[in-house]
Structures are given as structure tokens and as C-alpha cells.
Amino acid sequence: MSKIVKVIGREIIDSRGNPTVEAEVHLEGGFVGMAAAPSGASTGSREALELRDGDKSRFLGKGVLKALEAVNGPIAQALLGKDAKDQATVDQIMIDLDGTENKSKFGANAILAVSLANAKAAAAAKGMPLYAHIAELNGTPGVYSMPLPMMNIINGGEHADNNVDIQEFMIQPVGAKTLKEAVRMGAEVFHNLAKVLKSKGYNTAVGDEGGFAPNLKSNAEALEVIAEAVAAAGYKLGTDVTLAMDCAASEFYDAEKKEYNLKGEGRVFTSNGFSDFLEELTAKFPIVSIEDGLDESDWEGFAYQTQKLGKKIQIVGDDLFVTNTKILKRGIDNGIANSILIKFNQIGSLTETLAAIKMAKDAGYTAVISHRSGETEDATIADLAVGTAAGQIKTGSMSRSDRVAKYNQLIRIEEALGAKAPFRGLKEVKNQA
């Protein structure tokens, strides 16, 4: 009943109007799984390769016909007759067939779309929700939790056309008792932030991830207007709502000069100086998590940052670790950061993603499940967060259906699981239990 009989790939459109790969996996019993690959804007240099056509006459070179050739040709042929329930074998067949270190032959976008579609088809064949199937693949059947959201309500950096250098300013509704309540609190702060920005004469257009993208005077002002919005919504900053940031510091790092350049406010920092700047912000605001607070190659700087802040807050590696167990192991062995951001298109298969989550948890690191800035209506990351009991999810703001689709899926899952999937709030964040 779970043998693969057909694999289909197609080109669909993501939330930025660019093509991406969608795959369908059909099984013997008439079961079908469908999934789409997301796409990043600020990408780590060690990520698995997203294969684009480069033909400027189609989609400005961003077409994915080459990746589709792989899905509809060699991948489809190699998977015929294989058991979809054996996810590790399905993924390994594609990885071996590609034969490159970074999946550059077929593209991580091709392999991932098929990998996720296969998991969905297998879940359907087993007659269980995707999150339950993922928990079984993870070796933790029946173990679930609802993740604490990190909601990106002010967008800067590569996610917005403004003068704010730090890429994401996020809220975490830690005072909520349930995921559904956390979503409501986030929505209320989001709407109050719109009022605060308008009252100051700022633009309320949104960025790629659904957060506002105003031209603020400084990065600290982003935290100040969020603090105002939290109060206006009737919540207490630090108790009901905490703050988180994704610096995406590789985007404003000058490798030649070894400097971090916040152009928006005309300030330049050394590596340790930027970590000291972040420490100052954590003293002024209840920031409990900082992601990519330095360039992905600045391991020495990350050692200093972890030593400085790693006992107080969550230090998340995104571009630093790129969901790659080899790189994560180096971080763990050297005491670099204490958390990993999980983006399955950085590594390119569900099996490898689950391995990264397990390695992180075994080492006492937290794992934050994440979307990409280029998304679709595919909500697989919601099931991944619940099925691995990861504890935290980052899936954008309270606008744009490509973001909200994930929150809505989480609401449905929480309703289905009830007390079997506890919402632990701030306890999920490293150093905040």
C-alpha cells in the first residue's frame, strides 16, 4: 500500500513571485503527498544548492526547469517501487544519485520537495497526521509539544527595502498558556504596532515575512516601537512578551576590513565590539534570543559572544550552522552558540533535518524550526515543530497567507492533540527555564 508508483514535479510560484519546485509522490493505495520547496534571501554560503536555470528570458533566470528534469527523470525512476514509509532510504537514494556534497546536481529544491511529499504520502498511507508520522521517523512516537512562536514584526536587512540593518525584530508571546493564545497576543501586538508606527509618521508597508518595514532612525528604535506596541496591547514587556533578534550579520560584515557596518545608523564595529553592542541591547530590553549575531565565518568572534552572552540568553546559529550536522558538531565541540535554526532546504532532505535536530537536542542545544523568506502555502514546518517537540518556531508575522498558513496549521494541530501537546512558552528558550 505504501509503494511509490509515480513522482511528479512542477514549477509553482512562491511568495516573492519566483518559481519553486512542487512535488507529488503517488503510492499504490491511491495515497498522494504534495510539498513545495521554500527559498531564502539571506543565505549561508555553506547551504545545499538551490538549482536555478539561469535563463534570463524566463523568470529573470530564476526558473527551476533543470530541477524539475531531475524530479521527473532520474529521481522518479529511482524511487519507483520503493516503500515511502522508509524515509531514510528514499532520501539516501536521492542523495546518492545526486552524488555531490551540496546537492548541486539535482538541486536541494528538487530533492527536498520530493522528500517532504514522500513523508506526506507515507503519513496518508498510515492513516495518520503528518506530525504523528514525523514523530515516528524521529524515534519519538507520540511525543509532541506546541512551539513558542518567534514573530518577526519588524523586517530589515535583506527582507525589506529600508535603512534598518538588523534583519528581524521578533516578539515571543511567552505569557500565553496555549499556542492559540500566543497567536492572538501576537496579532494584537502586530495591530498596535501599526498604530504606533502611523502615529510617528512611519510607513506600514510590510516586508517579505509580513512584518512592517519602516525607515527607523536606529536599530534600537525598532525595539522601542515594539515595546510601545506591547504596552498599547495591554501586555507587560518581559513578562507577557519577550523579544528576539536575527541580526543576519553576514549581510553587513566587511570580510576584508573584518568590520560590522550598520550603515543605517552610521556605526562600524569590530567583531567583539558588535557582541558588546548586542550585550548593551540585552541590558536595555528583554531580548532572550539572538540569531546570527556575527558573520558565519567569524568562529573566534562567536566564541567570545557565546562566552559573553551564552549563559544568559539563547545564541542561535543559522548561517553559522546551515542545518548541517558536520558544521553543528564543530560548534558543539567548540562551545559555539547554544541553539540551531532548522531550515530543511539548507540541507535538502527530511532525514538530514531530523538528524540535525537530534544532534542539537542531545548536546543540550535548542532547535528553532524556521520558514524561509520565500515561502508557499505549504505548512510542513508546523508539523515538523510539533512532531519533533522542537519547542520553538519562526514563521514570520501576522500578515501574508504564506506566513499565516503555518500558524493556522498549528492551531488545528493543537485542537486535535489537546493536552498531549503541551505549550511550555519561555521554558523552551535556552537559559530561560
UniProtKB/Swiss-Prot annotation:
Biochemical pathway: Carbohydrate degradation; glycolysis; pyruvate from D-glyceraldehyde 3-phosphate: step 4/5
Single GO biological process annotation from the record: glycolytic process
Keyword ATP-binding attached: no
Phenotype upon changing residue 430 to R: Wild-type plasminogen binding in vitro,35% reverse activity (PEP to 2-PG)
InterPro entries: Enolase, Enolase-like_C_sf, Enolase-like_N, Enolase_C, Enolase_CS, Enolase_N
Domain of life, per lineage: Bacteria
Main location class: membrane
Knockout mutant characteristics: Probably essential, it cannot be deleted unless another copy is present in the bacterial cell.
Family: Belongs to the enolase family.
Free-text domain note: A 'plasminogen-binding motif peptide' partially inhibits binding of plasminogen to enolase in vitro; mutating 2 of the residues restores plasminogen-enolase binding.
Protein name: Enolase
